[in-house]
Amino acid sequence: MIKTRAIVLHRFPYSDSSFIVKVLTEESGIVSFIVKGGKKKESPFRGALDPLALSEVVFRQNPNTELQFIKEATLLDWHKDLRNDLLSLAKAQVITEMILRYAPQGVPLQEEFERLEQSLREFNETCGSSANAANAATSSSMQNAEQNATPSLNASATSASAIANSAESLSAIPASAHKSNIFARWLLDTCDMWGYNLDLETCSRCGHTLDKPAADFFPETGGFICHACLGVETPRARTETLQGLWALHNGDKIEHPEFTENALLAYLRHHIGFLKEIHSIKFLNETRKLFGK
């Protein structure tokens, strides 16, 4: 019997009452479960086997079959705040689909598990902090509106306190966990995990260390070009992409994350081949349009 933590990558119906669930486990890599009766309201697995949920599962692994029977599933983290942020949710779905389609099968994937767990936790924390800050600001505005035309000293102090608490909540998030960086950081780390190391600080032509954003980037080779080597040539990469990759390297906030994410996806696509379509990328692109990002 195996007892391990697992993150749900994908779930789809198997019959009128059952699911097939694919999870990334901490000890056994990617495992597929058949969950009989999983659609029923009284199912003991409700919530614990929802997509993106972190749970502790117990199962007996049968090497002679692809589908395993799950015995127990205990929900550890449902990532509620992540689910309430549509753009972060879309990025998380791309991450889980890429792992499901391209991570090595049939082997332990502890590093992939740890990195995915970290990314989901960071999404959840930053989404929660942003929501709390927005709620505090709204509450402060409502309190001010309820005061007389000449607000009291106590009312002003309450408003200032709410704003200060919001700022403190946001500042408590590590620089590496800027919401704008999380997906790009996962992509960069995945390049390393899967053997496609990307050097963000060295010019691929002269070998000199970059001290500012590169002048150009080539996703086909992963090469960065310094300004001296580029000379009068016209760069192919957008300025937003180059600045974003430099911000990622330094752990700073990425102002236009969609360009950085697309550049890293293009690099991985070239090396992996992306023979299997990543369907959730279409949803991500539509969500970006919705939010203007």
Which role fits each region the language model picked out?
Residues 1-19, 24-136, 142-154, 162-293:
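Non-catalytic alpha-helical scaffolds and adjoining flexible linkers that form interface surfaces
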